[in-house]
Amino acid sequence: MSEVPPTDEGWFVLHDFRTVDWDAWREAPTHRREAAVGDGVEYLRKHESIADAEEGSSAVFSVLGHKADILITHFRPTLDALSRAERQFEQTTFAGFTTQPTSYVSVAEISGYTTPGYFENPDAADEGLRQYMQGKLTPEIPNKDYAGFYPMSKRRGETYNWYDLPIDERAEMMEAHAETGKEYAGKIKQVIASSVGFDDYEWGVTLFADDPTDIKDIVYEMRFDEVSAKYGEFGTFYIGQRFPPADLGALLEGKAIPTVEQDVDAPTAHGEAHGHAHGDSPHGSGGGGGSSHGQSPGGASAGGSAHGTEDADHSDSRSTTSADTTQSDTSTNTNTQDSEIREQLAEYDIYAGQPHGEDVYATVLYSEATTDELFSEVEGLRGNFDHYGTHVKTAVYEARNRHRNAVVSIWETQSAAETAAGFISELPDVVSRAGEESGFGTMGMFYTVKSEYRGEFNDTFDTVGGILTEMDGHQQTDLMINLEDENDMFISSQWDAREDAMSFFRSDEFSETVEWGRDVLSERPRHVFLA
Protein backbone atom coordinates (compact mmCIF):
# COMPACT_ATOMS: atom_id res chain seq x y z
CA MET A 1 0.00 0.00 0.00
CA SER A 2 1.30 3.47 -0.90
CA GLU A 3 2.04 5.85 1.95
CA VAL A 4 -0.95 8.02 2.87
CA PRO A 5 -0.19 11.66 3.76
CA PRO A 6 -1.76 12.85 7.02
CA THR A 7 -4.54 15.44 6.78
CA ASP A 8 -6.37 17.93 8.95
CA GLU A 9 -9.76 19.48 8.20
CA GLY A 10 -11.21 22.94 8.68
CA TRP A 11 -14.24 24.83 7.42
CA PHE A 12 -16.89 23.20 5.25
CA VAL A 13 -17.75 24.57 1.81
CA LEU A 14 -21.02 24.63 -0.14
CA HIS A 15 -21.36 25.77 -3.74
CA ASP A 16 -25.13 26.21 -4.13
CA PHE A 17 -26.06 26.68 -7.80
CA ARG A 18 -29.50 28.04 -8.69
CA THR A 19 -31.38 28.34 -11.98
CA VAL A 20 -34.14 30.93 -12.30
CA ASP A 21 -37.49 29.91 -13.81
CA TRP A 22 -37.63 32.92 -16.11
CA ASP A 23 -41.10 32.14 -17.45
CA ALA A 24 -42.54 32.03 -13.94
CA TRP A 25 -40.63 35.19 -13.04
CA ARG A 26 -41.99 37.15 -15.99
CA GLU A 27 -45.54 35.97 -15.35
CA ALA A 28 -45.51 36.74 -11.62
CA PRO A 29 -47.32 39.90 -10.47
CA THR A 30 -45.18 42.86 -9.49
CA HIS A 31 -45.88 42.58 -5.77
CA ARG A 32 -44.71 38.95 -5.72
CA ARG A 33 -41.53 39.76 -7.62
CA GLU A 34 -40.84 42.62 -5.22
CA ALA A 35 -41.38 40.33 -2.24
CA ALA A 36 -39.05 37.74 -3.78
CA VAL A 37 -36.33 40.32 -4.35
CA GLY A 38 -36.80 41.72 -0.86
CA ASP A 39 -36.35 38.51 1.06
CA GLY A 40 -33.72 37.29 -1.40
CA VAL A 41 -31.64 40.38 -0.66
CA GLU A 42 -32.23 39.94 3.06
CA TYR A 43 -31.05 36.32 2.92
CA LEU A 44 -27.91 37.20 0.94
CA ARG A 45 -27.04 40.14 3.19
CA LYS A 46 -27.53 38.07 6.32
CA HIS A 47 -25.21 35.34 5.11
CA GLU A 48 -22.56 37.63 3.62
CA SER A 49 -22.38 39.42 6.97
CA ILE A 50 -22.19 36.03 8.75
CA ALA A 51 -25.23 36.84 10.88
CA ASP A 52 -26.13 33.14 10.79
CA ALA A 53 -22.89 31.87 12.35
CA GLU A 54 -19.96 32.88 14.53
CA GLU A 55 -17.46 32.54 11.68
CA GLY A 56 -17.39 31.98 7.96
CA SER A 57 -17.59 33.68 4.59
CA SER A 58 -20.28 33.89 1.87
CA ALA A 59 -20.73 35.53 -1.51
CA VAL A 60 -23.15 35.47 -4.45
CA PHE A 61 -22.26 35.34 -8.15
CA SER A 62 -24.12 35.66 -11.44
CA VAL A 63 -23.27 32.52 -13.42
CA LEU A 64 -22.86 32.77 -17.20
CA GLY A 65 -24.21 30.15 -19.58
CA HIS A 66 -26.99 27.60 -19.43
CA LYS A 67 -25.77 25.54 -16.47
CA ALA A 68 -26.97 27.94 -13.75
CA ASP A 69 -27.93 31.56 -13.16
CA ILE A 70 -26.75 32.17 -9.61
CA LEU A 71 -24.06 30.67 -7.37
CA ILE A 72 -24.17 31.18 -3.61
CA THR A 73 -20.92 30.09 -1.97
CA HIS A 74 -20.69 29.47 1.78
CA PHE A 75 -17.71 28.65 4.01
CA ARG A 76 -18.76 27.63 7.55
CA PRO A 77 -17.13 25.92 10.56
CA THR A 78 -19.62 23.01 10.57
CA LEU A 79 -21.51 20.93 8.07
CA ASP A 80 -24.67 21.66 10.06
CA ALA A 81 -24.18 25.39 9.46
CA LEU A 82 -23.96 24.76 5.71
CA SER A 83 -27.11 22.68 5.81
CA ARG A 84 -28.91 25.42 7.68
CA ALA A 85 -27.78 28.06 5.19
CA GLU A 86 -29.03 25.94 2.30
CA ARG A 87 -32.39 25.26 3.93
CA GLN A 88 -32.88 28.88 4.96
CA PHE A 89 -32.66 29.89 1.32
CA GLU A 90 -35.51 27.52 0.55
CA GLN A 91 -37.69 29.46 2.99
CA THR A 92 -37.46 32.63 0.89
CA THR A 93 -40.05 33.68 -1.66
CA PHE A 94 -37.25 34.02 -4.19
CA ALA A 95 -36.40 30.31 -3.85
CA GLY A 96 -39.84 29.53 -5.29
CA PHE A 97 -38.64 30.96 -8.61
CA THR A 98 -35.49 28.82 -8.67
CA THR A 99 -34.34 25.22 -8.92
CA GLN A 100 -31.04 23.72 -7.83
CA PRO A 101 -29.45 22.10 -10.92
CA THR A 102 -26.35 21.09 -8.99
CA SER A 103 -24.33 21.76 -5.85
CA TYR A 104 -20.98 20.82 -4.40
CA VAL A 105 -19.96 20.00 -0.82
CA SER A 106 -16.36 19.89 0.42
CA VAL A 107 -14.13 20.72 3.38
CA ALA A 108 -10.94 22.76 3.66
CA GLU A 109 -8.01 20.45 4.24
CA ILE A 110 -4.26 20.48 4.74
CA SER A 111 -1.97 17.52 4.18
CA GLY A 112 1.51 16.40 5.02
CA TYR A 113 2.82 16.21 1.47
CA THR A 114 5.17 19.15 1.82
CA THR A 115 5.10 19.77 5.57
CA PRO A 116 5.32 16.33 7.18
CA GLY A 117 7.09 17.80 10.20
CA TYR A 118 4.04 19.88 11.04
CA PHE A 119 1.92 16.78 11.48
CA GLU A 120 4.63 14.84 13.29
CA ASN A 121 5.17 17.55 15.90
CA PRO A 122 2.93 20.62 15.41
CA ASP A 123 4.03 22.13 18.72
CA ALA A 124 7.57 22.38 17.39
CA ALA A 125 6.52 24.25 14.24
CA ASP A 126 7.28 27.95 14.08
CA GLU A 127 4.44 30.35 14.72
CA GLY A 128 4.35 31.45 11.10
CA LEU A 129 3.76 27.92 9.87
CA ARG A 130 1.03 27.31 12.44
CA GLN A 131 -0.77 30.51 11.44
CA TYR A 132 -0.38 29.64 7.79
CA MET A 133 -1.90 26.20 8.29
CA GLN A 134 -4.76 27.66 10.28
CA GLY A 135 -5.40 30.12 7.48
CA LYS A 136 -5.67 27.32 4.96
CA LEU A 137 -8.22 25.61 7.15
CA THR A 138 -10.34 28.76 7.47
CA PRO A 139 -10.30 30.41 4.01
CA GLU A 140 -12.26 33.54 3.24
CA ILE A 141 -13.78 34.65 -0.05
CA PRO A 142 -11.58 37.49 -1.36
CA ASN A 143 -12.65 40.75 -2.91
CA LYS A 144 -12.41 39.72 -6.56
CA ASP A 145 -14.81 40.40 -9.42
CA TYR A 146 -15.00 36.89 -10.88
CA ALA A 147 -15.01 33.32 -9.65
CA GLY A 148 -14.53 30.05 -11.49
CA PHE A 149 -15.38 26.67 -10.02
CA TYR A 150 -14.75 23.09 -11.07
CA PRO A 151 -14.42 19.71 -9.37
CA MET A 152 -11.54 17.36 -10.07
CA SER A 153 -10.03 14.04 -9.08
CA LYS A 154 -6.74 12.21 -9.40
CA ARG A 155 -6.75 9.49 -12.04
CA ARG A 156 -6.92 5.85 -10.99
CA GLY A 157 -6.49 4.07 -14.32
CA GLU A 158 -4.61 1.03 -15.52
CA THR A 159 -1.80 3.12 -17.00
CA TYR A 160 -1.76 6.10 -14.66
CA ASN A 161 -2.81 5.61 -11.05
CA TRP A 162 -1.98 8.47 -8.72
CA TYR A 163 -2.61 6.42 -5.64
CA ASP A 164 -0.11 3.73 -6.64
CA LEU A 165 2.79 6.19 -6.85
CA PRO A 166 5.39 6.50 -4.07
CA ILE A 167 4.70 9.53 -1.88
CA ASP A 168 8.04 11.15 -2.79
CA GLU A 169 7.13 11.04 -6.47
CA ARG A 170 3.71 12.54 -5.79
CA ALA A 171 5.22 15.32 -3.68
CA GLU A 172 7.80 16.10 -6.36
CA MET A 173 5.17 16.49 -9.06
CA MET A 174 3.04 18.74 -6.90
CA GLU A 175 6.05 20.88 -6.11
CA ALA A 176 6.75 21.34 -9.81
CA HIS A 177 3.09 22.14 -10.35
CA ALA A 178 3.28 24.82 -7.69
CA GLU A 179 6.06 26.59 -9.56
CA THR A 180 3.68 27.24 -12.44
CA GLY A 181 1.25 28.87 -10.05
CA LYS A 182 3.86 31.36 -8.89
CA GLU A 183 3.54 33.16 -12.20
CA TYR A 184 0.00 34.16 -11.21
CA ALA A 185 0.91 35.94 -8.01
CA GLY A 186 -1.20 39.05 -7.74
CA LYS A 187 -3.76 37.74 -10.21
CA ILE A 188 -5.39 34.61 -8.83
CA LYS A 189 -6.69 33.62 -5.42
CA GLN A 190 -7.72 30.00 -5.10
CA VAL A 191 -9.45 27.86 -2.54
CA ILE A 192 -9.26 24.10 -2.86
CA ALA A 193 -11.29 21.84 -0.59
CA SER A 194 -11.48 18.07 -0.32
CA SER A 195 -14.72 16.34 -1.26
CA VAL A 196 -13.62 12.74 -0.84
CA GLY A 197 -16.65 10.94 0.57
CA PHE A 198 -18.75 14.10 0.29
CA ASP A 199 -19.36 14.53 -3.44
CA ASP A 200 -18.70 13.00 -6.85
CA TYR A 201 -15.11 14.21 -7.25
CA GLU A 202 -12.19 14.42 -4.85
CA TRP A 203 -11.69 18.19 -4.71
CA GLY A 204 -13.58 21.36 -5.46
CA VAL A 205 -11.46 24.17 -6.91
CA THR A 206 -12.58 27.80 -6.72
CA LEU A 207 -10.52 30.47 -8.49
CA PHE A 208 -11.03 34.17 -7.81
CA ALA A 209 -9.71 36.91 -10.10
CA ASP A 210 -10.42 40.44 -11.24
CA ASP A 211 -9.62 39.49 -14.85
CA PRO A 212 -11.52 36.36 -15.95
CA THR A 213 -8.89 35.54 -18.57
CA ASP A 214 -6.44 34.93 -15.74
CA ILE A 215 -8.66 32.03 -14.68
CA LYS A 216 -8.54 30.62 -18.19
CA ASP A 217 -4.79 31.14 -18.47
CA ILE A 218 -3.82 29.41 -15.25
CA VAL A 219 -6.04 26.39 -15.93
CA TYR A 220 -4.66 26.15 -19.46
CA GLU A 221 -1.02 26.45 -18.49
CA MET A 222 -1.27 23.99 -15.63
CA ARG A 223 -2.80 21.36 -17.92
CA PHE A 224 0.71 20.89 -19.29
CA ASP A 225 2.21 20.02 -15.90
CA GLU A 226 2.75 16.29 -15.47
CA VAL A 227 0.53 16.09 -12.42
CA SER A 228 -2.43 17.36 -14.47
CA ALA A 229 -1.55 15.94 -17.87
CA LYS A 230 -1.27 12.38 -16.56
CA TYR A 231 -3.25 12.33 -13.36
CA GLY A 232 -5.91 15.04 -13.51
CA GLU A 233 -9.59 14.36 -14.22
CA PHE A 234 -11.91 17.36 -14.37
CA GLY A 235 -15.62 17.90 -13.99
CA THR A 236 -17.90 20.71 -15.18
CA PHE A 237 -16.55 24.27 -15.19
CA TYR A 238 -18.53 27.33 -14.09
CA ILE A 239 -17.71 31.04 -14.32
CA GLY A 240 -19.53 33.87 -12.59
CA GLN A 241 -19.38 37.55 -11.70
CA ARG A 242 -19.70 38.62 -8.09
CA PHE A 243 -22.38 41.14 -7.21
CA PRO A 244 -23.56 42.73 -3.95
CA PRO A 245 -26.81 41.38 -2.46
CA ALA A 246 -28.55 44.71 -3.04
CA ASP A 247 -28.20 44.16 -6.80
CA LEU A 248 -30.31 41.01 -6.92
CA GLY A 249 -33.22 42.98 -8.37
CA ALA A 250 -31.00 44.57 -11.02
CA LEU A 251 -29.69 41.13 -11.96
CA LEU A 252 -33.21 39.79 -12.44
CA GLU A 253 -34.12 42.84 -14.53
CA GLY A 254 -31.20 42.25 -16.88
CA LYS A 255 -29.30 45.36 -15.81
CA ALA A 256 -25.54 45.71 -15.53
CA ILE A 257 -24.11 44.62 -12.20
CA PRO A 258 -22.81 45.85 -9.91
CA THR A 259 -25.07 48.86 -10.33
CA VAL A 260 -22.46 51.17 -8.80
CA GLU A 261 -18.74 50.81 -8.30
CA GLN A 262 -18.31 49.42 -4.83
CA ASP A 263 -16.46 46.99 -2.64
CA VAL A 264 -18.39 43.76 -2.99
CA ASP A 265 -16.84 42.26 0.08
CA ALA A 266 -19.35 42.10 2.87
CA PRO A 267 -18.13 42.36 6.43
CA THR A 268 -17.32 38.94 7.79
CA ALA A 269 -16.37 37.41 11.06
CA HIS A 270 -13.11 36.15 9.67
CA GLY A 271 -9.99 37.93 8.56
CA GLU A 272 -7.97 37.81 5.36
CA ALA A 273 -8.18 34.72 3.24
CA HIS A 274 -5.24 32.41 3.41
CA GLY A 275 -5.40 30.35 0.37
CA HIS A 276 -6.43 27.00 -0.79
CA ALA A 277 -6.69 23.95 1.27
CA HIS A 278 -6.82 20.32 0.51
CA GLY A 279 -5.18 17.13 1.44
CA ASP A 280 -3.93 14.85 -1.30
CA SER A 281 -4.02 17.87 -3.47
CA PRO A 282 -5.32 17.75 -6.92
CA HIS A 283 -2.65 20.22 -7.74
CA GLY A 284 0.85 21.23 -7.07
CA SER A 285 2.28 20.92 -3.65
CA GLY A 286 2.81 24.52 -3.10
CA GLY A 287 0.46 26.18 -5.35
CA GLY A 288 2.97 28.79 -6.00
CA GLY A 289 4.13 29.45 -2.56
CA GLY A 290 6.86 26.97 -2.40
CA SER A 291 6.65 23.73 -0.64
CA SER A 292 8.40 23.97 2.62
CA HIS A 293 8.01 26.53 5.31
CA GLY A 294 11.07 28.11 6.71
CA GLN A 295 11.21 29.95 9.98
CA SER A 296 9.36 32.89 8.66
CA PRO A 297 6.54 35.20 9.12
CA GLY A 298 3.55 33.51 8.82
CA GLY A 299 0.38 34.86 9.55
CA ALA A 300 -0.60 33.39 6.35
CA SER A 301 1.86 32.10 4.01
CA ALA A 302 4.22 33.93 2.04
CA GLY A 303 5.83 32.27 -0.69
CA GLY A 304 7.42 33.86 -3.54
CA SER A 305 4.10 34.47 -4.76
CA ALA A 306 1.20 32.58 -5.64
CA HIS A 307 -0.16 30.46 -3.00
CA GLY A 308 0.22 28.22 -0.10
CA THR A 309 2.69 25.49 0.24
CA GLU A 310 0.23 22.68 0.52
CA ASP A 311 -0.99 21.24 -2.67
CA ALA A 312 -2.17 23.85 -5.03
CA ASP A 313 -2.92 24.04 -8.67
CA HIS A 314 -3.24 27.68 -8.95
CA SER A 315 -2.14 30.83 -7.39
CA ASP A 316 -3.35 31.84 -3.98
CA SER A 317 -2.29 35.25 -4.67
CA ARG A 318 -3.90 38.52 -5.14
CA SER A 319 -3.28 42.13 -5.97
CA THR A 320 -4.53 44.03 -8.93
CA THR A 321 -3.11 47.08 -10.59
CA SER A 322 -5.30 49.99 -9.78
CA ALA A 323 -4.25 53.39 -8.72
CA ASP A 324 -6.10 56.56 -9.35
CA THR A 325 -4.82 58.92 -6.70
CA THR A 326 -7.99 60.82 -6.04
CA GLN A 327 -9.47 61.78 -2.75
CA SER A 328 -11.31 58.48 -2.63
CA ASP A 329 -7.96 56.86 -2.07
CA THR A 330 -7.75 58.41 1.34
CA SER A 331 -10.80 56.57 2.55
CA THR A 332 -9.45 53.26 1.36
CA ASN A 333 -6.76 53.17 3.96
CA THR A 334 -8.50 54.75 6.87
CA ASN A 335 -10.52 51.65 7.60
CA THR A 336 -10.18 49.73 10.81
CA GLN A 337 -7.81 47.07 9.54
CA ASP A 338 -5.35 49.58 8.11
CA SER A 339 -5.45 51.63 11.29
CA GLU A 340 -4.75 48.56 13.37
CA ILE A 341 -1.83 47.39 11.28
CA ARG A 342 -0.28 50.87 11.22
CA GLU A 343 -0.59 51.19 14.98
CA GLN A 344 0.99 47.81 15.58
CA LEU A 345 3.83 48.33 13.14
CA ALA A 346 4.56 51.86 14.32
CA GLU A 347 6.30 50.36 17.33
CA TYR A 348 8.86 48.88 14.92
CA ASP A 349 9.25 52.13 12.94
CA ILE A 350 7.57 50.35 10.05
CA TYR A 351 5.01 52.15 7.93
CA ALA A 352 2.17 50.04 6.63
CA GLY A 353 -0.84 50.47 4.45
CA GLN A 354 -2.93 48.78 1.81
CA PRO A 355 -2.70 49.88 -1.84
CA HIS A 356 -5.91 51.38 -3.13
CA GLY A 357 -8.02 48.73 -4.82
CA GLU A 358 -5.73 45.88 -3.86
CA ASP A 359 -5.86 42.96 -1.50
CA VAL A 360 -2.26 43.23 -0.35
CA TYR A 361 -0.55 44.88 2.60
CA ALA A 362 2.68 46.81 2.29
CA THR A 363 5.11 47.36 5.14
CA VAL A 364 8.00 49.78 4.80
CA LEU A 365 11.04 50.21 6.99
CA TYR A 366 13.75 52.83 6.58
CA SER A 367 17.39 52.15 7.44
CA GLU A 368 20.66 54.03 7.33
CA ALA A 369 22.70 50.84 7.01
CA THR A 370 24.81 50.48 3.89
CA THR A 371 23.01 49.02 0.92
CA ASP A 372 25.31 45.99 0.86
CA GLU A 373 24.72 45.22 4.54
CA LEU A 374 20.98 45.72 4.26
CA PHE A 375 20.64 43.69 1.08
CA SER A 376 22.58 40.79 2.61
CA GLU A 377 20.22 40.73 5.59
CA VAL A 378 17.12 41.01 3.42
CA GLU A 379 18.26 38.18 1.18
CA GLY A 380 18.38 35.91 4.20
CA LEU A 381 14.89 36.93 5.30
CA ARG A 382 13.52 36.61 1.81
CA GLY A 383 14.71 33.03 1.58
CA ASN A 384 12.38 32.23 4.47
CA PHE A 385 9.57 34.51 3.32
CA ASP A 386 9.46 32.73 -0.02
CA HIS A 387 8.23 29.57 1.67
CA TYR A 388 4.91 31.26 2.32
CA GLY A 389 2.16 31.63 -0.25
CA THR A 390 1.05 35.11 0.77
CA HIS A 391 4.47 36.67 0.29
CA VAL A 392 4.32 38.90 -2.77
CA LYS A 393 7.60 40.77 -2.63
CA THR A 394 10.41 41.98 -0.36
CA ALA A 395 13.07 44.27 -1.80
CA VAL A 396 15.61 46.94 -0.87
CA TYR A 397 15.22 50.41 -2.36
CA GLU A 398 17.83 53.17 -2.28
CA ALA A 399 17.03 56.88 -2.15
CA ARG A 400 18.28 58.66 -5.25
CA ASN A 401 19.51 61.86 -3.65
CA ARG A 402 20.43 61.04 -0.06
CA HIS A 403 21.69 58.27 2.22
CA ARG A 404 18.49 56.45 3.06
CA ASN A 405 17.41 52.93 2.19
CA ALA A 406 13.98 51.36 2.41
CA VAL A 407 12.88 47.76 2.77
CA VAL A 408 9.47 47.16 1.22
CA SER A 409 7.69 43.92 2.10
CA ILE A 410 4.33 43.17 0.50
CA TRP A 411 1.95 40.47 1.66
CA GLU A 412 -1.50 39.23 0.76
CA THR A 413 -2.81 39.21 4.31
CA GLN A 414 -2.74 41.52 7.27
CA SER A 415 -1.66 38.77 9.65
CA ALA A 416 1.30 37.80 7.47
CA ALA A 417 2.39 41.43 7.18
CA GLU A 418 2.22 41.83 10.94
CA THR A 419 4.29 38.71 11.53
CA ALA A 420 6.85 39.67 8.90
CA ALA A 421 7.20 43.07 10.55
CA GLY A 422 8.70 41.43 13.59
CA PHE A 423 11.47 40.04 11.41
CA ILE A 424 12.27 43.08 9.32
CA SER A 425 12.26 45.31 12.40
CA GLU A 426 15.46 43.55 13.45
CA LEU A 427 17.34 44.78 10.38
CA PRO A 428 20.35 47.02 11.13
CA ASP A 429 20.22 50.80 11.67
CA VAL A 430 16.48 51.20 11.45
CA VAL A 431 15.47 54.85 11.62
CA SER A 432 12.12 56.36 12.45
CA ARG A 433 10.74 58.28 9.56
CA ALA A 434 8.62 60.21 11.99
CA GLY A 435 11.88 61.79 13.14
CA GLU A 436 11.68 64.05 10.13
CA GLU A 437 8.50 65.33 11.74
CA SER A 438 5.30 63.51 12.34
CA GLY A 439 2.59 64.02 9.83
CA PHE A 440 1.09 62.27 6.84
CA GLY A 441 3.11 59.97 4.63
CA THR A 442 2.20 58.73 1.18
CA MET A 443 4.01 56.34 -1.09
CA GLY A 444 3.42 55.73 -4.77
CA MET A 445 4.21 52.05 -4.93
CA PHE A 446 5.45 50.22 -7.99
CA TYR A 447 6.24 52.84 -10.53
CA THR A 448 7.58 50.40 -13.09
CA VAL A 449 9.23 52.52 -15.76
CA LYS A 450 9.89 51.46 -19.33
CA SER A 451 13.68 51.21 -19.55
CA GLU A 452 13.93 53.63 -22.46
CA TYR A 453 12.18 56.32 -20.40
CA ARG A 454 14.09 55.87 -17.14
CA GLY A 455 16.24 58.98 -17.61
CA GLU A 456 13.24 61.07 -18.58
CA PHE A 457 11.34 59.79 -15.55
CA ASN A 458 14.18 60.87 -13.27
CA ASP A 459 14.25 64.31 -14.86
CA THR A 460 10.49 64.67 -14.43
CA PHE A 461 10.80 63.67 -10.79
CA ASP A 462 13.33 66.47 -10.30
CA THR A 463 10.93 68.94 -11.90
CA VAL A 464 8.02 67.82 -9.74
CA GLY A 465 10.32 67.83 -6.72
CA GLY A 466 10.98 71.49 -7.33
CA ILE A 467 7.24 72.17 -7.31
CA LEU A 468 6.84 70.22 -4.09
CA THR A 469 9.43 72.25 -2.23
CA GLU A 470 7.25 75.33 -2.75
CA MET A 471 4.07 73.69 -1.49
CA ASP A 472 2.68 74.32 1.97
CA GLY A 473 2.94 71.35 4.29
CA HIS A 474 5.52 69.46 2.23
CA GLN A 475 8.42 68.03 4.24
CA GLN A 476 10.44 65.59 2.15
CA THR A 477 10.09 63.53 -1.02
CA ASP A 478 12.47 60.79 -2.13
CA LEU A 479 12.66 58.70 -5.27
CA MET A 480 13.48 55.17 -4.08
CA ILE A 481 14.99 52.75 -6.61
CA ASN A 482 15.03 48.95 -6.34
CA LEU A 483 18.61 47.70 -6.04
CA GLU A 484 17.75 44.69 -8.18
CA ASP A 485 15.66 46.45 -10.82
CA GLU A 486 16.42 50.07 -11.63
CA ASN A 487 13.10 50.38 -13.46
CA ASP A 488 11.16 49.58 -10.27
CA MET A 489 10.71 52.67 -8.11
CA PHE A 490 8.49 54.25 -5.53
CA ILE A 491 8.12 57.83 -4.41
CA SER A 492 8.08 58.36 -0.67
CA SER A 493 6.64 61.66 0.45
CA GLN A 494 6.14 63.21 3.88
CA TRP A 495 3.62 65.97 4.62
CA ASP A 496 2.46 67.91 7.65
CA ALA A 497 -1.10 66.67 7.16
CA ARG A 498 -3.23 64.58 4.85
CA GLU A 499 -4.93 67.63 3.38
CA ASP A 500 -1.56 69.08 2.36
CA ALA A 501 -0.83 65.95 0.34
CA MET A 502 -4.31 65.93 -1.15
CA SER A 503 -3.89 69.52 -2.30
CA PHE A 504 -1.02 68.35 -4.46
CA PHE A 505 -2.92 65.33 -5.74
CA ARG A 506 -5.75 67.62 -6.82
CA SER A 507 -3.40 70.03 -8.59
CA ASP A 508 -3.05 70.46 -12.35
CA GLU A 509 0.65 69.67 -12.05
CA PHE A 510 -0.07 66.28 -10.58
CA SER A 511 -2.76 65.50 -13.18
CA GLU A 512 -0.37 66.41 -15.98
CA THR A 513 2.36 64.25 -14.48
CA VAL A 514 0.03 61.27 -14.19
CA GLU A 515 -1.09 61.71 -17.78
CA TRP A 516 2.51 61.91 -18.93
CA GLY A 517 3.31 58.79 -16.95
CA ARG A 518 0.85 56.69 -18.93
CA ASP A 519 3.35 56.60 -21.79
CA VAL A 520 6.50 55.95 -19.80
CA LEU A 521 5.29 53.40 -17.25
CA SER A 522 4.97 49.73 -18.14
CA GLU A 523 1.96 49.43 -15.83
CA ARG A 524 -0.28 51.78 -13.91
CA PRO A 525 1.17 53.12 -10.67
CA ARG A 526 -0.33 51.80 -7.47
CA HIS A 527 -0.53 54.07 -4.48
CA VAL A 528 -0.30 53.39 -0.79
CA PHE A 529 -1.42 56.03 1.68
CA LEU A 530 0.22 55.90 5.06
CA ALA A 531 -1.21 58.06 7.80
Curated annotation (Swiss-Prot):
Listed PROSITE patterns: ABM
Keyword terms: Heme, Iron, Metal-binding
Biased composition (Basic and acidic residues): 271-281, 308-317
Biased composition (Low complexity): 318-338
Matches recorded under InterPro entries: ABM_dom (IPR007138), ChdC/CLD (IPR010644), Dimeric_a/b-barrel (IPR011008)
NCBIfam families attached to this UniProt entry: PRK09565.1, PRK12276.1
Protein's recorded name: Putative heme-binding protein HQ_1094A
